Amino acid sequence: AQSVGITEMATMLRDDLRALGFQEAEVVPTDGHPGVWGYYNAGAPRTLVVYMMYDVQPVEENWRVPPFAAQLVDTELGQVVMARGATNQKGPERAFLNALSSIIAVDGKLPVNVMVLAEGEEELGSPHYGQLVDRFEARLRTADGVFFPFNSQAPDGSIAMSLGVKGILYMELESRGGSWGGPTQAEIHGSYKAIVDAPAWRLTQALASMTSRDGNTIVIPDYYNGIRPPTPEEQRLINALAARGGDERGRASLGVERYIDGLSGRDVLVRQFYHPTLNINGISSGYAGEGVKTILPHRAVAKVDSRLPYGLSPDTALARIRRHLQANGFGDIIVRQLSGYPAAQMSVEAPIIQAALSVYRKYGITPTLAPRLAGSAPFYQFTERLGLPLLFSGLGYGTGAHAPNELMLVRPVAGSRVAGLAEIEKSYVDLLFALRSAAPASRR
């Protein structure tokens, strides 16, 4: 996400695909970070697209080990590889490539044709992934489904499998001194607040105008319009999830004592999957260091994201936000869209989903199925644009994505129900062979 090592990583992935015997493997330029394309022609009737990402989040302080050394560390769960990208997303992706290598070593070729389309900007909101899809669209449309290798197990070995993702609108809102007031060139002495407007106050007031006082309900006109309610299939999944309970467990995992508005049970799930959010990631203005410095800053900036349920597009959401600010006297607030894409949704009946469920049954696992993930990924490029079903799931446990000490479990302790690296790779082998005999994907 900081444009460090991008060319090296793209080249490494391309070379890995070539080493596996992919007949096509190339680094593909975009207007941003390059993508990587690979094609393995097994002469098979089924074709699988594999979505990959080779970029990672920045590293922070408080790491137990050097974040890019990929050291093995012993924990109470077993031996883990601890590194930035261990679980998000290089660990599962390398395990998948290892599975391909094993099949080729034993059988001489893969059971399905494989297309790899990787990006280096997922952590930036995938602003140029569409250019990669443009380049290979005709060939991608011939595929039967899409797979994103993913560590889905909890520490107890259970799996929560999601059938979709929310979309996202990521924005930067800025207030600067101008004709409305405030210093226009640079910060000034704080004593002048007696006679000069403050961009920092103006920005916070503009932000506050968009939600209820507690920040939990979006009050922008029409913002909830167009959101598709749960289908009958999704209602059944929600009811099954709610019947399992888990409010206390969920709060503990997030480190919170209560959900907003005192939500519990089924209401938590509906709110999480079917309501949009408006979240302030950070606000910066003026001086926030140690000691005392009295200034009136000339600008203030907020990073804001809105998670978008199925039916609310980023373009529509952005237009409604701008219209609201203008109507409420905040037309001077600068709104810059940094990234955005719509939601994606799959059916549990899709052949690739059914193939995954059959593999999990082989390992004695019955996944918990959720209509969608509350997070976001650019899967709409496949599900909505190309009409391809997509699976993002897999054996394996990891934690700490976007945080210090990110890890992926590779050798579980005795008696653990979590898959280690070898079992993860075996499950990917099983999935590829299950896909070989799966029914053709239906086209939307």
What feature does the model see in each segment?
Residues V196, E290-H298:
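Short, solvent-exposed beta-strand/turn "edge" segments of beta-rich domains on protein surfaces
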Residues G190-N216, A319-R320, S358, I365-P367, ...:
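His/Asp/Glu-rich mid-to-C-terminal helical/loop segments that flank catalytic regions of hydrolases
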Residues L207-T211, G215, A240, S347-L390, ...:
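Active-site-adjacent substrate-binding region
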Residues A154, L163-G164, I168-Y170, W180-I283, ...:
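Acidic-enriched catalytic cores of C-N bond-cleaving enzymes acting on peptides and small amides
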Residues P45-A118, A414-R417:
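Active-site metal-coordination/substrate-binding segment of hydrolases
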Residues S306-P309, I334-E349, R372-L373, P378:
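A short beta-alpha structural unit
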Residues P111-I195:
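Histidine/acidic-residue-rich, glycine-tolerant segments that coordinate divalent metal ions
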